[in-house]
Amino acid sequence: MNRLSREVPIDPPHAALLIIDVQNYCIGASTSEYFLRSLRDTVLPNVRRLQFACRGAGIEVIYSVIENMTRDGRDRSLDYKISGIDVPRGSSDAQVLDEIAPAEDEMVFRKTSSNLFISTNIDYVLRNLGVRSLIIAGIMTDQCVESAVRDACDLGYLVTVVIDACTTTSAERHEQSLLGIRGYCRQRTSDVLVAEISVNSSNQSD
């Protein structure tokens, strides 16, 4: 009998919160009213709560942003070139939104493709940190978030997606993406996950 399961609670010393692409570029590039409203009203407040809970529990808080290594974008993936996704190195578009700005010494990975694990060395760094489980939040649910979930799972991480700390351009696309990746991850609301982190953090200190 297979007793392995994805339903493993967060173990703070071996976990990281990964916040994907919540940056100035994604605000300016979007024309979706649903996306902008859900980001402002739901995602950002919930990401802030996750940051607070994770920092308090000693869980690494890590960010990814879309950002070229060059000013002219010649290093971008072919897909990003075709799609017109161009965030020059050092530009304001590459900055994490002020509402959830990284704290001192929190890591920001700069990527040039939809897949964080393909175009950065994050897997190497996570293994150096002893991370075995990832809490994933950010944008877009059906694009960069989904890509990260699938690859993280294939690389051997236990993944929890925070369903009300992610969004995309429509409710339908958000729900379809969550349905499609259900076999790769746990899915929790921010309320449930913050409570879980609090309990497990307390248990660690007892």
Locations of the language-model features?
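Short acidic/His/Gly/Ser-rich catalytic and metal-binding motifs that mark active-site loops
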Residues: 25-29, 71-73
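Early exported N-terminus immediately downstream of N-terminal targeting peptides
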Residues: 60-61, 65-83
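Acidic-leg catalytic submotif of subtilisin-like serine proteases
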Residues: 16-26
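A short alpha/beta connector and helix-capping loop motif
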Residues: 13, 31-66
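Active-site loop/turn elements of alpha/beta-hydrolase fold enzymes
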Residues: 22, 66-68, 164
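Active-site-adjacent betaalpha module
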Residues: 1-16, 49-57, 80-206
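Short amphipathic alpha-helical segments
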Residues: 30-32, 75-76, 147-150
